[in-house]
């Protein structure tokens, strides 16, 4: 990679600002004997009367050990959308800079670009849903700050070619964000093991999918310590509440991740085999995620028929390259069997 310098990317007002700090940010170790008269809290204990740990030390410590990474290379957010928004706000100058996204893909990249007044350059994936590297490189200019890669991709379900990702990491002097929300369901490994090799690499993951904690809203961003330090300047001080931190840590310690992932992957295989025999399904796309994208002869019709039967899936027909496509999340064995029964009866 040529001439990457994070100081050339960060917004000037962010570069020079001082982060908000609570008094407790100054303490690395707390004891039960400490008296807290710093934050104007209600002193009467009910289990939630105190502000949460702004640094999420226990939760970060567990995740750091699990992923063999330093805590200063990690940022936790109120869902992945918060950490993605922080990346926009730290590095993209409104009404000046641009980002590149690769439709069909996760819609929040475009939404966050609009919220932050950043031009979103859309470079369509190829017919087999892979990054069109030549077109991406053509669209990069001096104001391009970020390229977003969702791999495994939502809604298509496939993982991106390693060589394509490496080409961008090595040739783009901006930030490459790889969204790995579905990585635990993929036969491909995470890019986390090379996070220290590429200072322009950011990886987002989540506890919402494989870890079954969508209700807690905890997203994770991994990057260099320099990038994390910048993002910590603008992170709200108490962005993850006590209940979420404690519940997440408890569930991680009792993790049934491998068991659930294996069941979902097995159900995914069974779902594909069942869908093959349904006449109006024209194509079943390969999936590395916990969902399957299918092409049917009339997506609106089939979507509405399923709604009438009390089954909610996602109609992705409004996405580029996804005409008449439906996205089906892999559910429990019973839910999947009900879906197949209804589809066969349509």
Curated annotation (Swiss-Prot):
A matching Pfam family: Aminotran_1_2
GO terms classed as biological process: L-histidine biosynthetic process
Domain of life assignment: Bacteria
Positions of modified residues (N6-(pyridoxal phosphate)lysine): 209
Reaction(s) catalysed by this chain's protein: L-histidinol phosphate + 2-oxoglutarate = 3-(imidazol-4-yl)-2-oxopropyl phosphate + L-glutamate
Pathway recorded for this protein: Amino-acid biosynthesis; L-histidine biosynthesis; L-histidine from 5-phospho-alpha-D-ribose 1-diphosphate: step 7/9
Top enzyme category: transferase
GO terms assigned for molecular function: histidinol-phosphate transaminase activity; pyridoxal phosphate binding
Cofactor: pyridoxal 5'-phosphate
UniProt keyword Transferase, yes or no: yes
Listed SUPFAM superfamilies: PLP-dependent transferases
EC number of this enzyme: 2.6.1.9
Alphabetized CDD domains for the sequence: AAT_like
Keywords: Amino-acid biosynthesis, Aminotransferase, Histidine biosynthesis, Pyridoxal phosphate, Transferase
Family stated for the protein in its record: Belongs to the class-II pyridoxal-phosphate-dependent aminotransferase family. Histidinol-phosphate aminotransferase subfamily.
Binding partners and assembly: Homodimer.
Protein's name in the database: Histidinol-phosphate aminotransferase
Organism: Flavobacterium psychrophilum (strain ATCC 49511 / DSM 21280 / CIP 103535 / JIP02/86)
Biological classification of the source: Bacteria, Pseudomonadati, Bacteroidota, Flavobacteriia, Flavobacteriales
